Amino acid sequence: MTKIIYCIYLKKYAEGLKFPCYPGKLGEYIYKNISQEAWNKWQNVQTILINENKLNMLCAKDRSIIEKKMKKFLCLKPL
């Protein structure tokens, strides 16, 4: 059975994520407030950002950049 949540990105009710896709408190917040559709859109944008900016996800600085972009893209409040 699918979980329906109010997605703060799409501003409508939609199918929620099947499991938390991000660690920590931010991951819990995303799980409760971001839909699968919005997360898929973010993953596409994330891939473009990583490739165009040649970011290395093993580097903490680059991961921080992606996290900031994710928060902005998904309209997440500061935690």
Swiss-Prot record:
**PANTHER family assigned to the protein according to its UniProt record, in alphabetical order:** FE(2+)-TRAFFICKING PROTEIN-RELATED
Q: Quaternary structure?
A: Monomer.
Classify the source by domain of life: Bacteria
**HAMAP family referenced in this protein's UniProt entry, alphabetically:** Fe_traffic_YggX
Family of the protein in this entry:
Belongs to the Fe(2+)-trafficking protein family.
Cite the Gene3D superfamilies for this sequence: Fe(II) trafficking protein YggX
Keyword S-adenosyl-L-methionine recorded: no
Q: Which UniProt keywords apply?
A: Iron
Tell me the GO BP annotations in alphabetical order.
cellular response to oxidative stress
Keyword Iron in record: yes
Segment forming the signal sequence = none
Taxonomic path: Bacteria, Pseudomonadati, Pseudomonadota, Gammaproteobacteria, Enterobacterales
Return the protein name: Probable Fe(2+)-trafficking protein
**Record GO terms (molecular function):** iron ion binding
Task performed by this protein: Could be a mediator in iron transactions between iron acquisition and iron-requiring processes, such as synthesis and/or repair of Fe-S clusters in biosynthetic enzymes.
Q: Under the cellular component aspect of Gene Ontology, which terms does the record hold? A: cytosol
**Record's InterPro entries?**
Fe_traffick_prot_YggX (IPR007457), Fe_traffick_prot_YggX_sf (IPR036766)
